[in-house]
Amino acid sequence: MSNVPHKSSLPEGIRPGTVLRIRGLVPPNASRFHVNLLCGEEQGSDAALHFNPRLDTSEVVFNSKEQGSWGREERGPGVPFQRGQPFEVLIIASDDGFKAVVGDAQYHHFRHRLPLARVRLVEVGGDVQLDSVRIF
């Protein structure tokens, strides 16, 4: 098990067709966790994608952050995560957005608000036990 926060540098960035696969376990007492695709390694970097399962409020929020300001929140349908259960999330970059796949089902399509080419870091944190973070 990896510990969180987990950070993976992406010096080459990501491009359409890149797949990020996150496998882990939602702890029994989990409140929320996040996956961020950040545009830099420094604190406060812009976020091209903020994927935030919130078990405490039964929602999954998608957002972006630019120049310190969060954008408009989008929500996926229902919460495909359960406390005490393992999960697999695929985040697939395309020309027009990020497709989130949870388990075997497409979950939400988040349209790009920042250029995909700016992404330099994957960060996973919060209430989650990570098994692996892979980039294909």
Curated annotation (Swiss-Prot):
GO BP term, pick one: apoptotic process
GO CC, alphabetical: cytoplasm; extracellular exosome; extracellular space; nucleus
Subcellular locations according to the entry: Cytoplasm; Nucleus; Secreted
Keyword Secreted: yes
One of the record's GO molecular function terms: carbohydrate binding
Primary location class: cytoplasm
Residue span, Galectin domain: 6-136
Record SUPFAM superfamilies: Concanavalin A-like lectins/glucanases
Tissues with expression: Mainly expressed in stratified squamous epithelium.
Swiss-Prot/TrEMBL keywords: Apoptosis, Cytoplasm, Lectin, Nucleus, Secreted
Gene3D superfamilies associated with the record: 2.60.120.200
Annotated PROSITE patterns: GALECTIN
Main function: Could be involved in cell-cell and/or cell-matrix interactions necessary for normal growth control. Pro-apoptotic protein that functions intracellularly upstream of JNK activation and cytochrome c release.
Designated name of the protein: Galectin-7
Organism of origin: Homo sapiens
UniProt lineage: Eukaryota, Metazoa, Chordata, Craniata, Vertebrata
